[in-house]
């Protein structure tokens, strides 16, 4: 069928590509695949689905090494070498809900195909992403809700009352939405 699409993919005319030719998992990769199911081109979703499943072993090592958590995680950058660790800048690199967001694509494919054998195949991947957050969620001291922490709202920063600019937060709205969907689907 082909390969999953990254920001510059095959169309780059240089050896060193912008964004390192990686897969940005904070909307870019996902958005490239949104039309697949709704346009009745489900087979175009398959490379992303296979790539997602291939991230699990590396993501399990990252979950254990960085968070001492079960399951699997991937951050904002991905590539063909199964890179799942945090990126180098906290404003975007600390985003740890990318595996959960990728699992939305696994479930969307099932919703359009209703293929139960396929769902049995991808469910362990979805469950592993959910297990990571079962271990990672913490109680917000003010609201008492379970939230992701540490996390970011990708590529956003916050100005603190003292004027300092920070990127790391707890319970970003994006995380809340992605995790609600992941937990609903698993």
Regions found by a protein language model. Give the residues of each.
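Short amphipathic alpha-helical face segments that pack within enzyme cores
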Residues: 31, 101-105, 128
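The feature captures the catalytic groove of carbohydrate-active enzymes
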Residues: 9, 14-22, 70-119, 134-186
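Hydrophobic (often cysteine-bearing) scaffold residues that line and stabilize catalytic clefts
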Residues: 28, 41, 45, 98, ...
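Carboxylate/His-rich catalytic cores and anion/metal-binding grooves
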Residues: 25-72
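Structured segments of extracytoplasmic/periplasmic soluble domains
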Residues: 35, 51-58, 109-112, 129-132, ...
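Extended, well-ordered alpha-helical scaffold segments
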Residues: 1, 44-55, 118-133, 182
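Short, small-residue-biased leader/transition segments that mark boundaries at the very start
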Residues: 2-7
């Amino acid at each position: 069928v082909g390969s999953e699409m990254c920001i510059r993919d095959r169309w780059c005319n240089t050896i060193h590509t912008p964004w390192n030719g990686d897969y940005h998992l904070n909307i870019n990769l996902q958005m490239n695949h949104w039309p697949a199911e709704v346009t009745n081109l489900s087979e175009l979703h398959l490379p992303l689905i296979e790539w997602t499943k291939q991230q699990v072993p590396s993501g399990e090592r990252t979950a254990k090494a960085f968070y001492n958590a079960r399951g699997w995680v991937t951050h904002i950058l991905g590539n063909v070498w199964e890179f799942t660790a945090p990126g180098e800048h906290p404003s975007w690199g600390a985003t740890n809900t990318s595996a959960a967001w990728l699992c939305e694509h696994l479930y969307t494919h099932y919703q359009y195909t209703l293929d139960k054998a396929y769902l049995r195949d991808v469910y362990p991947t979805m469950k592993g992403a959910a297990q990571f957050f079962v271990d990672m969620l913490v109680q917000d001291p003010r609201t008492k809700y379970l939230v992701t922490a540490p996390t970011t709202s990708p590529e956003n920063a916050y100005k603190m009352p003292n004027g300092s600019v920070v990127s790391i937060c707890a319970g970003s709205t994006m995380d809340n939405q992605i995790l609600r969907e992941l937990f609903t689907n698993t």
